[in-house]
């Protein structure tokens, strides 16, 4: 990932690979359905040479490049419909594999990129309507979605039938209070999958609410920096990439922290740069380095313009 900024600056033809991005994204997600392993009621990844790979983490990046290259190519209604259909296909594959957290991230990312490219609020309203209808359908179609909604409503009433994880998460956050129990003094092992989906609860318990709030502020600071870089980019392709990757990052942070604090139903996504998981960490490194490459590219362009004057 450290060479990504150099590649972004030196190679100028990323915007021409729309079909390649779509094919790679769809095949990678479809492979999970064919050979994926079930974890927590969802097919999230598969094992290659003893290494667990979660394609959806890397496909989020490829998806952003696909949408950006497609909108850079044309903003005609026909192309928007075709792009929307392919984007929806990505989301439907994730829904079929029951990776609803990643599906929601791609959905929000697409809506944001669509608005940035077209500045048409009607598209956003149509997308929100379709998303609301899809949420209702998912509630009645998938048992584990209904369970998560019930757990979100009252995790203590469903303590023995799915609410244990969220209930223990709330206990851990409450136990840590503002200053925490101390490093290694908590009992995060009482929360299932604490090192991935519920790492924020362990941090709150051992290091306290103040430290947890600082972590949230760091995430918000990273997002704001993404948005500042996106606003400064003149080329539509690069602007869309920065907006898309920044949106994917902050939505993932929101879903993770919101799920463990019972603000929203748990979606099973990881906290970038914090949760355990090779695919998650690698994809986050790539995201940050792509945006860094865009920043360096913009800075070099400004320096060249200044020297030309």
Where does each model-flagged region fall?
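A juxtamembrane structural motif centered on a specific transmembrane helix
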Residues: 256-309
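TM-adjacent membrane-interface loops and short helices in multi-pass inner/ER membrane proteins
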Residues: 155-200, 209-211
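Hydrophobic alpha-helical transmembrane segments of multi-pass inner membrane proteins, especially
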Residues: 1-162, 201-261, 286, 290, ...
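Arg/Lys-rich, often Gly-containing low-complexity segments of ribosomal proteins
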Residues: 41, 175, 267
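Alpha-helix boundary/capping detector
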Residues: 84, 126, 138, 175-176, ...
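Short clusters of hydrophobic/aromatic residues that line enzyme substrate/ligand-binding pockets
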Residues: 46-48, 53, 178-179, 183, ...
């Amino acid at each position: 990932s450290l060479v990504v900024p150099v590649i972004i600056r030196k190679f100028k033809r990323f915007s021409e690979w729309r079909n390649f991005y779509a094919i790679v994204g769809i095949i990678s997600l479809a492979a999970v359905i064919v050979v994926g392993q079930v974890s927590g009621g969802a097919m999230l990844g598969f094992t290659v040479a003893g290494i667990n790979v979660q394609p959806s983490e890397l496909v989020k990046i490829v998806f952003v490049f696909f949408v950006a290259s497609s909108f850079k190519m044309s903003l005609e209604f026909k192309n928007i419909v075709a792009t929307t259909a392919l984007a929806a296909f990505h989301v439907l594959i994730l829904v079929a594999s029951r990776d609803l957290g990643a599906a929601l991230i791609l959905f929000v990312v697409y809506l944001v990129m669509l608005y940035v490219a077209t500045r048409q609020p009607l598209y956003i309203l149509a997308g929100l309507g379709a998303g609301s209808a899809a949420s209702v359908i998912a509630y009645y179609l998938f048992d584990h979605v209904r369970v998560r909604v019930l757990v979100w409503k009252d995790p203590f009433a469903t303590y023995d039938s799915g609410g244990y994880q969220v209930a223990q998460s709330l206990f851990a956050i409450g136990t840590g209070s503002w200053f925490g129990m101390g490093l290694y003094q908590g009992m995060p092992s009482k929360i299932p999958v604490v090192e991935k989906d519920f790492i924020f609860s362990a941090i709150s318990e051992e290091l306290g609410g103040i430290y947890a709030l600082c972590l949230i502020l760091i995430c918000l600071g990273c997002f704001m920096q993404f948005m500042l870089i996106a606003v400064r980019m003149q080329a539509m392709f690069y602007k869309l990439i920065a907006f898309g990757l920044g949106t994917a990052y902050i939505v993932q942070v929101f879903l993770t922290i919101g799920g463990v604090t019972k603000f929203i139903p748990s979606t099973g996504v990881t906290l970038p740069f914090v949760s355990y998981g090779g695919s998650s960490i690698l994809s986050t490194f790539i995201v940050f380095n792509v945006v860094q490459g865009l920043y360096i590219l913009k800075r070099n362009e400004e320096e060249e313009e200044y020297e030309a004057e």
